[in-house]
């Protein structure tokens, strides 16, 4: 049940607090504009929310947030675990300013073995199903592809698409170099291939020694039967496997699946390094950098805000979570997780946020090795409940796990140092550009730059790109592509006019509507919508082009009533060499040649190159799609479903063109008469 406080009534904390129940749930704080400030959970909503307004020793950040609260909403849940799950979903959806946020990375790669009678080994991203076998997740695409190469070398499983597999008449190059047993042409029986698939799966699950022993027995059996050629093939397989195991000897431990989480804070930023061990193999790591840490609350459950008499209980509860299956000397006290207590650190809060946002809704390994004790005592229980198996946290590991944690902490420090260095250089470049262009900006982090580029191939598949630079970095989530239509092919000026009009016309209309609403209601000052529209307008608009392109942009901005001083063209220098560009202005200022050593020009070139990359990749994809599908789309009697069946059956347009009438007629939904018609239209 959700209980919102009406937005049109004065905010009276005492009245609201008196109505709150002593039940678990989630609370949300809003400011006067309706923006979400903070989302939290509680075992007891009344005591938790009341603590924000009754405590006198609030930190400056918490006190600042409390002064901005204009509305409170609460949702009662059946349990605290349910509240934790709802809190996580709301944080991801609403991105409150005072919550620690991690990028929602749901696209971890997996290694997939398909359910085909000759299973295919493939790189995969997306949701998993029960039909196929999935191994992972892996921390990077490189880790998956490395594993695929290992399995190709040792077990020679196929990697080709089913459409290619079904249409091969002779082995491919991978068979010739010993990377595939060519099941497509019957070079291996289904039973023998199934054995290789089983061995590959056990290898990925960390049962390498078991696979090696079975291969050795198989080799001796072949030799005893005087099948020396088969025995030699198994020997070579064992040799390849032994080489792989030797190369990974440092990485292989006794654990099957373990995640290592190291949190490091420095220079006002925090890094979480996640290292993954799958099947006993250390697959690498990935660094995460949360946002809103500088304004996030240092409030752990059981800390400042929960029931006072429950603080000690919260601190004492976490050590009662033993770690199962400790075979490397982690036993005793080291196998338990210490409670965070009332004084939860920033690292503990960040770890809480990461575990909640990363694992809830995703696969969880049975063991998490952590550098800090998490602040929430309920997190472990919820993870175990969701995963369907016990999830253990190890705070003070020993042996191989200790080495893994130390390495993760070191990598977190390195990644954080690199980030701080890059941020420093980016901030210097932003400052240099603002000074060069004479911009007055109190907070350089709010400086917003948008850059436009046009891309096409001899007038074909024209696309415009818009990339955004904000908060000292490229904001890929705000990139946009625009399909350009209704112009003369190859007319870059018309394309630029169209994209600028489409981009900024809506913003101007929104601001005008908000201003009209203010006038009608008698409200003094900008409305929220008008403020939002104004905040989206950039401080600088970069145009990839010279005087002609800038003149078109000036005309569009004049028609829309926008300030033309923000328009800057980036004219390429002699030979298109970086550092020789000239900045061209729409308001009549003298063009600038900054030189290749200029920090301002480095930033301009970085943004311009990103706009070009984004435009050209979109244009190529659009062109390829048009060329691949255009001929099939023109076929009479062939709709989307039949076209999809043809492409799946023959592996692409080239295969459809090469197919005979009989082969075309063998496709489901294609009659012999239609097959003849298709054949005639394609030849």
From Swiss-Prot:
GO terms for cellular component: cytoplasm; excinuclease repair complex. Keywords: Cytoplasm, DNA damage, DNA excision, DNA repair, Excision nuclease, SOS response. InterPro entries: GIY-YIG_endonuc, GIY-YIG_endonuc_sf, GIY-YIG_UvrC_Cho, Hlx-hairpin-Hlx_DNA-bd_motif, RuvA_2-like, UVR_dom, UVR_dom_sf, UvrABC_protein_C. CDD domains: GIY-YIG_UvrC_Cho. Residues 22-100 form the GIY-YIG domain. One of its GO terms (biological process) is nucleotide-excision repair. Residues 209-244 form the UVR domain. The keyword Ribosomal protein does not apply. GO terms for molecular function: DNA binding; excinuclease ABC activity. It is found in: Cytoplasm. The UvrABC repair system catalyzes the recognition and processing of DNA lesions. UvrC both incises the 5' and 3' sides of the lesion. The N-terminal half is responsible for the 3' incision and the C-terminal half is responsible for the 5' incision. PANTHER family: UVRABC SYSTEM PROTEIN C (PTHR30562:SF1), UVRC/OXIDOREDUCTASE (PTHR30562). Interacts with UvrB in an incision complex. This is UvrABC system protein C. It comes from Burkholderia vietnamiensis (strain G4 / LMG 22486) (Burkholderia cepacia (strain R1808)). The lineage of its organism: Bacteria, Pseudomonadati, Pseudomonadota, Betaproteobacteria, Burkholderiales.
